[in-house]
Amino acid sequence: MITEEVKSVLMNSMWDLATCANGEPNVVPVAFKDVSEDGKLLVGDVFLNVTLKNLNANGGRIAVSAYDAQTLTGYQVKGVAEYVTDGPVVAAFKAAVEKMFNGAAIAKGALIITPERVIVTTPGAQNGSEVK
């Protein structure tokens, strides 16, 4: 599902996380992100307060959008997020945030997103199709 092309776009682009609860959508850009070797999307929690509230209310449902601004190649990943507050993923994000913000911000945890569907958002004939 997370092909090499999808992973390349994810690794080289900013992500927007979309969640919804009680009919109120929310979207937030994230910079502290990664793709695990098993294809899960990892997001460091620095400013995800509304996102976390929505995930708690909606059973963890989330969508991630990323695209290459030069080529317009893009994907939307839909899946389920789990929130963790310790372990190697959280430790890595804590170190990265500490380094960037010199203590002015901290990573409180991480989202581990299990993809269920990957949808092409690139303009053209494949737009809207699902990556298998």
Where are these regions (language model features)?
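Binding-site signature for planar aromatic cofactors or substrates
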Residues: 1-132
